[in-house]
Amino acid sequence: MKLIILDRDGVVNQDSDAFVKSPDEWIALPGSLQAIARLTQADWTVVLATNQSGLARGLFDTATLNAIHDKMHRALAQMGGVVDAIFMCPHGPDDGCACRKPLPGMYRDIARRYDVDLAGVPAVGDSLRDLQAAAQAGCAPWLVQTGNGRKTLAQGGLPEGTRVCEDLAAVAEQLLQEA
């Protein structure tokens, strides 16, 4: 199985300091849906791992989050792309959970669900916490320079072996060339 794990905000869609709180606020980044479609069509299983503390903060509810994800799934389907599963942490930063990135809990859940060893599985994010969680789980961290990615790159301290690409389309291109 060829598995790839993506962060959502800043990788697939535009990020917002005020959170993505409704389907109207969910706007795909240029080329991201096409990248997922290319990966899907090349037999990759695409999974999201996303912190959604807006739930804990009361900024939106589960029904709204599901509506946001429905919008994403519909847009992807039009291009032949599929996100097989969405793993998310609904907790706030101070809740003490094991699933909130930079902790690797969501990634370990993915490994159990798909019965895979995550060693070398590409995990794409735009923030240091995405990359830290991925590296702790044994994934190969990839930083995109969309969302908070440029700032993350400038701040340094990336996990060893982190690969850097302009955006998700460039990640997909690299992976498909290497396959």
Curated annotation (Swiss-Prot):
It is found in: Cytoplasm. GO terms for molecular function: D-glycero-beta-D-manno-heptose 1,7-bisphosphate 7-phosphatase activity; magnesium ion binding; zinc ion binding. GO terms for cellular component: cytoplasm. The record marks 50, 101 as: Stabilizes the phosphoryl group. Pathway: Nucleotide-sugar biosynthesis; ADP-L-glycero-beta-D-manno-heptose biosynthesis; ADP-L-glycero-beta-D-manno-heptose from D-glycero-beta-D-manno-heptose 7-phosphate: step 2/4; Bacterial outer membrane biogenesis; LPS core biosynthesis. Its cofactor is Mg(2+); Zn(2+). Belongs to the GmhB family. This is D-glycero-beta-D-manno-heptose-1,7-bisphosphate 7-phosphatase. It comes from Bordetella bronchiseptica (strain ATCC BAA-588 / NCTC 13252 / RB50) (Alcaligenes bronchisepticus).
